[in-house]
Amino acid sequence: MPKRTLQGVVVSDKQAKTVVVRVDRRFTHPIYKKTIRRSKNYHAHDENNEFKPGDMVWIEESKPISKLKRWTVVRGEQRKTA
């Protein structure tokens, strides 16, 4: 079975080799038919501490690394600086 991959934005990099990634999802409410946006934070392993808050990253499911980390950063795009 293939590993799940999610796309999100880094919201915190204050831990060593770990980033917190916010993943947004959209769905339609089954009764009211309104599009709703929900978000969830995932702790992901970042071996080289290369991603900073605001960067767009892709995370992939992995075996448990610690109590909260079950995802690994696969690739990312640094945000453009002005």
Swiss-Prot record:
Superkingdom per UniProt: Bacteria
GO cellular component assignments: cytosolic small ribosomal subunit
Keyword Iron among UniProt keywords: no
Biological processes, Gene Ontology terms: translation
Single GO term (MF): structural constituent of ribosome
InterPro entries found in the cross-reference section: NA-bd_OB-fold, Ribosomal_uS17, Ribosomal_uS17_bact/chlr, Ribosomal_uS17_CS
PROSITE patterns given in the database record: RIBOSOMAL_S17
Keywords attached to this entry: Ribonucleoprotein, Ribosomal protein, RNA-binding, rRNA-binding
Gene3D superfamilies attached to this UniProt entry: Nucleic acid-binding proteins
Keyword Ribosomal protein listed: yes
SUPFAM superfamilies the UniProt entry points to: Nucleic acid-binding proteins
Similarity remark: Belongs to the universal ribosomal protein uS17 family.
Subunit-structure text: Part of the 30S ribosomal subunit.
Task performed by this protein: One of the primary rRNA binding proteins, it binds specifically to the 5'-end of 16S ribosomal RNA.
NCBIfam families registered for this protein in UniProt: PRK05610.1, uS17_bact
Name of the protein described by the UniProt record: Small ribosomal subunit protein uS17
Organism name: Nitrobacter winogradskyi (strain ATCC 25391 / DSM 10237 / CIP 104748 / NCIMB 11846 / Nb-255)
Taxonomic classification: Bacteria, Pseudomonadati, Pseudomonadota, Alphaproteobacteria, Hyphomicrobiales
